[in-house]
């Protein structure tokens, strides 16, 4: 590597990115077409310890975008989406103070319309009486 950052730093940045990925429900990553996942470098100026980034495409709000999830010093996340919406306009929302258990819901909110997600979180159950 031509970077001056020691390998141990890269390893811990990769662990941070992997931890974030594990905190996002797999169905959320699949539904937004998450691909080209990578880790983010720490940024003392922004008080960011590292993070996860990935591309998304063909969501109900976003045609194509890059998502950045940054781990902040206060142990919350900042989620940035930078891309193009379905009307081909610039789309750059930010959510701050996101806790790990909120990541899936926040990503759904940033990438999908309410109409698209209204049935996703409601389990459909049919009760059948078994005679025996």
Residue ranges and their predicted role:
Residues 2-61:
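Negatively charged, low-complexity tracts enriched in Asp/Glu with abundant Ser/Thr
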Residues 56-58, 71, 81-83, 129-132:
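Surface-exposed beta-strand edges and flanking loops
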């Amino acid at each position: 590597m031509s970077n001056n950052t020691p390998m141990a730093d890269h390893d811990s940045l990769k662990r941070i990115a992997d931890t974030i990925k594990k905190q996002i429900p797999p169905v959320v990553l699949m539904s937004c077409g998450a691909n080209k996942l990578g880790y983010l470098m720490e940024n003392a100026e922004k008080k960011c310890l590292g993070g996860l980034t990935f591309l998304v495409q063909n969501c109900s709000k976003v045609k194509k975008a890059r998502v950045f999830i940054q781990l902040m010093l206060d142990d919350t996340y900042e989620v940035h989406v930078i891309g193009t919406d379905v009307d081909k306009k610039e789309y750059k929302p930010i959510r701050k103070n996101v806790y790990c258990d909120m990541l899936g819901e926040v990503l759904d909110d940033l990438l999908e319309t309410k109409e698209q997600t209204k049935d996703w979180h409601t389990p459909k159950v049919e009760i059948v009486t078994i005679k025996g």
